[in-house]
Every structure is written in structure tokens, then in C-alpha cells.
Amino acid sequence: MQKTWSDRFEEGLNPFIESFNASINFDFLLIEEDLDGSIAHARMLAKTGIITSEEADQLEAALQKIRLEASQGLFKPDISDEDVHMSVERRLISILGPLGKKLHTARSRNDQVGTDLRLWLRRRIDDIDIELKKLQVALFKKAEKNLLTLIPGYTHLQRAQPLSLAHHLLAYIEMLQRDRNRLADVRERVNICPLGAAALAGTSLPIDRAFTANQLGFTSIYSNSLDAVSDRDFTVEFTAAASLIMTHISRLADEIILWASEEFSFVRLTDRCSTGSSLMPQKKNPDVPELVRGKTGRVFGHLQSLLTMMKGLPLAYNKDFQEDKEAVFDTVKTVRDSLKAMTILLEEGLEFSLERLKETVEADFSNATDVADYLVSKNIPFREAYQIVGRVVRLCIQKKILLKDLTLKEWQEINTLIDHDIYEKITPEKVVAARISDGGTGFDRVREELEKWRNDLISLNQ
């Protein structure tokens, strides 16, 4: 196929350079958005009198025909098309003849591709938000069933204080909500229309940019044509938000991997979401969370590549921008697939080992802080109480017993203010229930949080 720009040149492209230069192998993914943008552009050209209404109707009918052909696999790109825009134009001209050549009036591929990518990403952000909500619901259902289930809480991966398992799971719901809020914020800046900026300076024709933007569901237009065709901030913002999503679910994935190990044994992996070893017949491997954890670095890499691509570009459009799409496309797929995999894992891939959890929270010194709090209630300054309990823990370790195993006499030898009620205060259930501050793991506080999230997420289940 002859290039649209070939009249300027005396020689054809080197075949390898033609392939190297082309983006059609990956940007054909934008076919729907390219057709949407072209239909809106044709309507605008008719509204402003640049083409007739009859011509616009014919263009729209032909573009819809191309959409149908693409959906049926009948319209396929060719390497000579260079990109999705030229592929559509080639087919349009083959259908309409000279009329097809009018569509690109007052438009450049520079503003066209920016429009296509924004339309595509806007839809994908909405898709990812749905997957985030589904994962929140899966976490909520696990949390709702485990309000009274206790799990060790850790700092530095050392046992710290016991928690309600529901409280632990709700922490991830909070993270995912921040992710959703960030995506909504990014979407606002994705939803600005560059169409009409043309190559870089605008056009001398009497176009109506606001009309086109409205047709495509954009909330506003770019105020500066140079910025319109050269802005890829939205790809960086999206990939940064996606990186945080992956960070959060990678943390959850890593915990599940630990919990599923024999050393922890907090969860049992089901056959539905596990694989085995080709050599060791006893193995059941947590491949799903491991893959999610591994794919996180892939998204981080895309963020870095986009930042590096943009950092040295003069205004306005540069061919470097062709490299933005694969990074964005793969980020979307990776995030969406990872969220879906984690949701399935929570729904049917793991079961909490309640007996093991109970055994674990009863077999450590994570109730030591509550002994200090008990002494504070007896008017002993906290730092002094802290030091007393440190000595008590050391004594227990030497005797190979737990705090609950100390006799009342031994307690009172430590401090005469300690009474028999100390035993009730340091049971794991009482330790958790005592955390009554807002946002704490106390059962009443967690019950309130569950109710809040039930109201927030209920619409998804309808």
C-alpha cells in the first residue's frame, strides 16, 4: 500500500525499517476507539459545514461496516498500514472511494492517537475498578465470617499483638479503596479531549472541538494544542496508580504464601488454585499468589519506561510516544488479570485453619503489652510498667512457660498490685476486645467497620 506521505519521497522504505516503524501489530487494539473518534469527527465536520450531512452519514455507515468486519475477523491490518489509523483509512477509501479521503480533514494522527488512547484507557479504568470492587467483596466475605477468629499480628515479622482476622482482612479493603479513589482521580485527567489540536498548532478550519468532545463523553478539551498532542502524563499517572494496586495485592499475596507454608499453616490451599511439583509428589504450590507477586515488578518496569521515555522530549509530538501503548496495554492486562486471580483465590482457593490460628495466638507473649496496660491502670507509669513486664517475659522464657502459667504468688512477687484478675486480662480474646480505640482491632470496632463496608459494597452484589 502506498503511504499517505509517500509523494514527498523519492524512494520506498527499507522493508525492515517499515516493520520497525510500524505499530499496527499492537495498536490495532484501539480499533473500536479509533472508529468512535472518527464517527464523532465526521459528525463535527458536518455540523460545521466542512462536509455535507449526506457525506457524514455515508462516512458513519462505512465506519460502522468496518466495525462489524473487525468484530467478525474479516477486517485485518497489514504491516503496510503502519498503524490503526491508516488501516481504517485504507479500508474506508476502499469502501467509499474519494469521499473516504475527506475524513482526515482538520485532523492529524497526533491528536487522533491521543484521543484513541484516552478513550481506551477510560474504559479500562472502569473495568479495573469493577475488579477492585470484586476483590473487596471477596475480602469482606472472608472478614465477615472471621470477626471472632484471632490471628497473630506482626511487626518486623515477629509476633506482636493478637488481632481479629476480620480486622486484618479489612486493612486490605482499605488499601483497595484508596486504589479506587486514585483511579477515579486519574480518570478525570484521562477524560480530556485532544481532538482538534491537529498536528501541533490547531487548524485554520472552523471546527467545533467542544462538540466532538461531548460526542465522545469527554468532560473538557485541552486549552493548548502543543500540550494536547504531547501530553502523556495520564499514562504515567495510570501506571503509577496501577503500581500501587499491584503493591497492595502483592503484599496480600506474600502473606498468603507465608500462611500456606508448613511453618505457619494458617491457611490450607485448595486443589482449585494450586499446582504440584514434577518431582516431589507431596507438594502443593501457591502459584497464584507467587505469580501475582512476580507480575508486580513487570508493572513497576512499565512505569519506569514511561517516565524515561518522556523525560527528554521537546515539544510537541515525537515518535517516541509510540512506545507508550504496549506499556499501558500490558499494565492494564496484568492488573486486571492479577485482581481477578486474587479474587478467585479468596473465593475458592484457600481456607483458614482455625485450630492452628487458635493454637498460635495462645502460645506466645503477644499479650505482654496488656500486662503493662494492666499495671498502668494501677497508676504505675507506662515506662516503668514496660520495664517490669520485660523482666517478667525474660523470667518466663528462662522457665519455659507463658505469662498465663505464672502463679499468682509469682505475679505478686513481681508487683504486689497484681491481682487474680490478671489472668482474665491476658487471654487472647480479652486482649483483642480491649482495643477499643477508633480503628482498632476490638471486636466492637471491627463490627462497626464491617457494617460500614457492608453498606458501601452491597450494591455490587445486587
Swiss-Prot record:
It comes from Prochlorococcus marinus (strain SARG / CCMP1375 / SS120). GO terms for molecular function: argininosuccinate lyase activity. GO terms for cellular component: cytosol. Keywords: Amino-acid biosynthesis, Arginine biosynthesis, Cytoplasm, Lyase. Pathway: Amino-acid biosynthesis; L-arginine biosynthesis; L-arginine from L-ornithine and carbamoyl phosphate: step 3/3. It comes from the Bacteria. Its main location: cytoplasm. GO terms for biological process: arginine biosynthetic process via ornithine; L-arginine biosynthetic process. It catalyses: 2-(N(omega)-L-arginino)succinate = fumarate + L-arginine. CDD domains: Argininosuccinate_lyase. This is Argininosuccinate lyase. The keyword Cytoplasm applies. Pfam families: ASL_C2 (PF14698), Lyase_1 (PF00206). Its EC number is 4.3.2.1. Belongs to the lyase 1 family. Argininosuccinate lyase subfamily. The gene is argH. It is found in: Cytoplasm. The keyword Lyase applies.
